């Protein structure tokens, strides 16, 4: 969906300085993801549509909020843990989520690794001694099947476990084709980590995409982000967790929002997040309870946020 179509469908976008916002962070709006959303408060629109607030500096802004720059031994590679290596296959996404923690910085120049960089990152992963490689981006499913499978095959057999961190089943569910699913199944163990923030994102098309993966034996887990005005209440998070478990998707992490420049409107104070999580814990079973985590700017890696009965 282009700017003209989006502005016609969502009249409040007329007040948005589209050029300025998109020059800082791209805008991409698939019709399928937006679905029938039409009100400013719809969670899909809040997280996908550009807003002038993205241009406003905030005292809490941290350009690299999870400390990836200092933990990047090569372009397109992040190494925070001895047993894991993260490879960024691309900077492209099907939707550019306005709260994204990598919106201000990603290791690597351009939209995709060069051939030389691609070879170097796979060589690094193979020699790393890691037990898991995380394929991320951008969105790793914004690359072709051939490119994705080349990344998986390129680190095997040295690295046994592959994780594909993607929003494609949610934002572009037609990407989850029979060919892709069979390729992932044949390369097991491959875990798919999806990113659902609100029950409204679980459309019939998304359900079908998730089912294709799970039915083929590809394990699927979810990571959400606690977002102001989107899911910052326990009832919404509980509904999401229950819906995920019904779809055989494990609610793995609830991330405290990272303070990257441009996403201040989505941030939730930590004390409030703790209170919300304490309430959530009373509303769902252990199976449906994600771990509430924070990824600090020192690059040491995420940790579980301690929460007592009152928050």
Put a short name on every predicted segment.
Residues 107-108, 137-138, 164:
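Surface-exposed cleft-lining segments at the edges of enzyme active sites
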Residues 20, 275-311:
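C-terminal accessory regions of radical SAM enzymes
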Residues 1-80:
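Flexible, acidic/Gly-rich N-terminal and inter-domain linker regions that tether
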């Amino acid at each position: 969906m282009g700017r003209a179509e989006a502005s016609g469908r969502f009249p409040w976008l007329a007040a948005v300085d589209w050029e300025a916002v998109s020059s800082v962070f791209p805008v991409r709006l698939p019709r399928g993801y937006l679905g029938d959303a039409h009100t400013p408060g719809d969670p899909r629109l809040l997280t996908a549509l550009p807003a002038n607030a993205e241009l406003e500096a905030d005292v809490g802004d941290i350009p690299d909020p999870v400390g990836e720059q200092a933990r990047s031994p090569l372009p397109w590679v992040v190494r925070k843990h001895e047993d894991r290596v993260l490879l960024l296959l691309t900077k492209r996404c099907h939707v550019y989520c306005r709260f994204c923690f990598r919106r201000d910085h990603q290791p690597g120049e351009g939209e995709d690794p060069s051939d030389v960089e691609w070879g170097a990152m796979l060589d690094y992963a193979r020699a790393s001694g890691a037990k898991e490689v995380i394929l991320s981006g951008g969105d790793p499913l914004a690359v072709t099947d051939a490119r994705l499978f080349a990344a998986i095959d390129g680190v095997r057999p040295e690295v046994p476990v592959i994780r594909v961190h993607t929003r494609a089943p949610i934002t572009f569910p037609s990407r989850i084709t029979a060919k892709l699913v069979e390729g992932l199944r044949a390369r097991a163990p491959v875990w798919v980590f999806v990113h659902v923030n609100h029950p409204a994102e679980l459309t019939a098309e998304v359900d079908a995409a998730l089912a294709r993966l799970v039915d083929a034996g590809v394990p699927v887990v979810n990571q959400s982000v606690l977002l102001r005005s989107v899911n910052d209440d326990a009832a919404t998070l509980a509904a999401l967790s229950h819906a995920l478990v019904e779809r055989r998707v494990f609610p793995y992490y609830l991330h405290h929002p990272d303070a990257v420049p441009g996403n201040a409107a989505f941030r939730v104070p930590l004390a409030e997040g703790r209170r919300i999580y304490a309430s959530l814990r009373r509303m769902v079973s252990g199976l449906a309870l994600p771990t509430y985590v924070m990824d600090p700017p020192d690059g040491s890696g995420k940790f579980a946020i301690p929460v007592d009965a009152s928050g």
